[in-house]
Design a protein with these regions (language model features):
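Active-site nucleophile and cofactor-binding loops and adjacent substrate-binding regions
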Residues: 76-84
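Flexible, glycine-rich active-site loops centered on histidine and acidic residues
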Residues: 2-22, 83-114
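N-terminal beta1-alpha1-beta2 module of alpha/beta enzyme domains
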Residues: 1-76
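Conserved beta-strand edge residues that scaffold enzyme active sites
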Residues: 48, 79, 110-111
Length: 114
């Protein structure tokens, strides 16, 4: 019998003017909660809009999430490749995968186009 998998994508939209530490804390609490509920995957992307989209580095956020979760896979949805050298992206993803015990999933895309 097939098993249904569940995942969540975090669009990091927060109230403008809210303290960034509070925003990160809430987002990390969400990952922890999803892990406890048995979700299979959690995804977050790279956003550079100031104020309400605060995750400029999904790898850094997911490394923190990996320390607070145990089973859920953690995906970059997406790393905006035009902004980064491919070698650096590969190195960060390898490190993230090691730090999360093999739970990292790589997703890439063009990001916002001019």
């Amino acid at each position: 019998m097939s098993r249904i998998n569940f995942g969540a994508f975090l669009a990091p939209h927060h109230p403008i003017g809210e303290h960034p530490m509070l925003q990160f804390q809430r987002d990390l609490d969400l990952v922890e909660h999803l892990d406890r509920l048995g979700y299979n995957e959690f995804w977050c992307g790279e956003h550079h809009s100031t104020g309400w989209e605060t995750i400029a580095s999904p790898e850094m956020f997911l490394a923190a999430a990996g320390q607070r979760s145990h089973r859920i896979k953690l995906g970059t949805g997406v790393v905006s490749l035009p902004y980064h050298h491919p070698y650096n992206v590969a190195q960060r993803m390898v490190q993230l995968d090691h730090m999360t015990g093999g739970r990292a999933i790589f997703g890439s895309g063009p990001g916002a186009l001019p």
